[in-house]
Amino acid sequence: MPKISGGKILPIYITGHAVLHAPAKPVTDFSGIQEIVRDMFATMFAAPGVGLAGPQIGLGLRIFVYSYTEGDTLHQGVAINPDLLIPKGVPKRQTHKQQANNSTSCDEPDREGCLSFPGYQFPLERAPQVTLSAFDENKKPFTVHATGWLARIFQHEFDHLQGTLYVDRLAQKYSGEVRQAVLNNKWGIPGKYWVPQEPKE
């Protein structure tokens, strides 16, 4: 996609805000989507992060942006009304209880963070490969076959559109740390947010 420029830096909502914990609705009106995409990229770059979903900026729509550099390759784009497929034979992402009771994994657990649970990272098992099918900001369909960290990013952002944060998927042994983080930061209630700073030139 072309170089991203412009856009407003928006508040990023923190766990407890209702839109983060409810399934997002499909995008049906593409007339103002270009501005939304610019604002989402500006906010993600300022954070900084590698992905940002609509619910994180208080927008309950099925849209996310991503930007991740792997070696000399830049993976960057917007996914609107996405579907995520884990290939047959690849273990599916596990639920909270399944991860607590199942020692088998689909890859080594890398640590994840989230702009809606800022300042913390926890290990989480993810499928090592996925296929993302979605529409871009011009309503053009596309498909991406992703592995490794790009696959992890897609799963993380897709979860946001389902009303799920990555901390909801952690193994049971981390639940105490998650609860304590929420208490310490007075999260878990509607309206909590933070605003990324404008990147310095």
From Swiss-Prot:
Protein biosynthesis keyword on record: yes
Listed CDD domains: Pep_deformylase
Record GO biological process: co-translational protein modification; translation
Pfam families, sorted: Pep_deformylase (PF01327)
Cofactor note: Binds 1 Fe(2+) ion.
Residue sites binding Fe cation per the record: C114, H156, H160
GO terms, molecular function: metal ion binding; peptide deformylase activity
EC number of this enzyme: 3.5.1.88
Active site per database record: E157
Reaction equation(s) it catalyzes: N-terminal N-formyl-L-methionyl-[peptide] + H2O = N-terminal L-methionyl-[peptide] + formate
Keyword Iron: yes
Named cofactor requirement(s): Fe(2+)
InterPro entries tied to this protein: Peptide_deformylase, Peptide_deformylase_sf
Keyword annotations: Hydrolase, Iron, Metal-binding, Protein biosynthesis
Enzyme class label: hydrolase
S-S pairs: none
Family annotation (SUPFAM superfamilies): Peptide deformylase
Family: Belongs to the polypeptide deformylase family.
PANTHER family: PEPTIDE DEFORMYLASE, PEPTIDE DEFORMYLASE, MITOCHONDRIAL
Annotated function: Removes the formyl group from the N-terminal Met of newly synthesized proteins. Requires at least a dipeptide for an efficient rate of reaction. N-terminal L-methionine is a prerequisite for activity but the enzyme has broad specificity at other positions.
Name recorded for this polypeptide: Peptide deformylase
Gene that this sequence comes from: def
